[in-house]
From Swiss-Prot:
Residues 626-688 form the S1 motif domain. This is Polyribonucleotide nucleotidyltransferase. It comes from Helicobacter acinonychis (strain Sheeba). It is found in: Cytoplasm. The keyword Cytoplasm applies.
Amino acid sequence: MDFITINSINKTEEFALKQVAKQATSSLLYRLGKTIILASVCVERELVSEDFLPLVVQFLEKSYAAGKIPGGFVKREGRAQDFEILTSRLIDRTLRPLFPKDYRYPTQITLMVLSHDIENDLQVSALNAASAALFLAHAAPFKSVSACRIARIDNEFIINPSTSLLNQSSLDLFVSGTKESLNMIEMRSLGQKLNALEEPLMLEALELAQKSLKETCTLYEETFTPHQNALLFKESQGIVFNERLLDLLKNQYFNEIIKGIESSALSERENVFNEIARKISEAHSEFNLEEIELSLEKVKKTEIRRMIIRDKIRPDKRALEEVRPISIESNLLPMAHSSILFTRGQTQSLVVGVLGTDNDAQTHESLEHKAPIKERFMFHYNFPPFCVGEASSIGATSRRELGHGNLAKRALETSIKNKDQVIRLVSEILESNGSSSMASVCAGSLALYASGVEIHDLVAGVAMGMVSEGQDYAILSDISGLEDAEGDMDFKIAGNLEGITAMQMDTKMSGIQLEILYQTLLQAKRVREHILKIMHEAKEKIVINFSHLPTTEIFNVAPDKIIEIIGQGGRVIREIVEKFEVKIDLNKPSGEVKIMGNKERVLKTKEFILNYLHSLDQELEQYAIDEVLEAQVKRIVDFGAFLSLPKGGEGLLRKQHMERCQVALKEGDSIRCRVISFNKGKIALDLA
């Protein structure tokens, strides 16, 4: 068992090697203060034949890590929570580019949170633990990678802030990479204002992150290299292509390949390439279908990159900075509070907005918070198979759908002025040919406005890409699905005219240089300006249907009257909600009543509640202390009996008064009783 301590910027990390989970390929216990994470890597030695990287990353939170028992009916951890899925994606997207292109050994990385202090950053800790475990496993010649988070408080950048400091920040920037370059970025603005960050300041933050990562990665490599396992698998020489087959494709089928590349729809493109493969397979039996498809893919990729880098022309004939045609329609769905159809080329997003009450907010439990938190702004992204021409069933929400919805939410959240509003936006992707999450941001921003939600400014998003060959590279604006698949970078950037509110960068390379990232940010700003101009023109044409939008009426009653509005077993409030078709939130301690719904119904509901409470007060005023009444038993309960009083209303005869007089009552009996007190709007009775 080995213990390693590493001191880096603003934190001291401890690693216990070979202490637990020793049957895994590698394992360690990561400790940062009171946060402890078990990281394990398991690598199977049997190759898989499929052409993909068989990597699985799972980040798991245990409730006991914070001294909690899981909420809900089942008292054990079940389906992964959103934070766990998003953190798993964060780690996967960082580590995946490090693997050799022909790595085909099933690999599982598991991060299990065993103890957690909420002041520590779980995502940075989990990624650093995963990186160390993968480096120690030595399944392939990996570079060391690490993560850091950057906050901005009072115009000063802070590296690896505590949770309490991050809550005061206007910036949340998560960056991971090697000591040479960055390979994954997540960013969002924070606070009550929009807090969009200008591009020069973003570069400054990224430079600070790069410096931190370089220091940490250097320490990791120096410290962990002596503890690495023996190299399990050496990097192979890659696929050996048949030169005769490549020449055949370039000479006889080149025009058909170009036709496939220029096909805008994914299904159409696949049909072209499948037909080429079929023709060659039938005409040349010496080549098997697998090597034909691999060679075809190589020629296609080479030609796409040549077109972009040498000719500065993209597969769909656009210039490098050209954005596809944009159209925007509003108020398509008459019963929704808002609906926006945003179309950019062959990517189409229908975003629907609905406003709700406090009861509609999504409640989450997390190790990051002591108590359950309420998510008031929700953005749900759906990617049905028909949007890319696939014939398959629609299943549960995928990791990708959850991630894209979270990105859109982060882009728009600070644009909302009133953070107490409960808002749900749903993006239905009806067509997809790249950049659907950024189309969702554009449509979502307009949907907020169309719902009558006050916003600081419109927010637009664009997906940027890059293609590189050696020292040459080209940055692409508004990438298509083909450019995303064949390119080296997917950089989604959202913001307004002033700066950036959210961004997400992934790469298929080992990393991207800061100079290229900054050029991409500046190019994306020009694209945003173009898109925002179109969005502002569309905004002017939106007619907000205030008569259909829900309105909220808030008023106060005496706190002891709230129970009267609720009624026995919730009977009264259920009847009110069903009668007027509204939503009601009640606050017992303060006596606040919040009604939400159609304006006319809301006003009628308020009037009904006030009249109802007034009538109850009048009933009480008819009776006096020590007044003797002839009452009728209305219902028997465990603690006594409720009696109907002769002048209206009801009173409670408690069980102890019945037992003292040895009276056995049943419903419908008449009995003489005496008023003994008024308590919180209730009449207490005794036998006369």
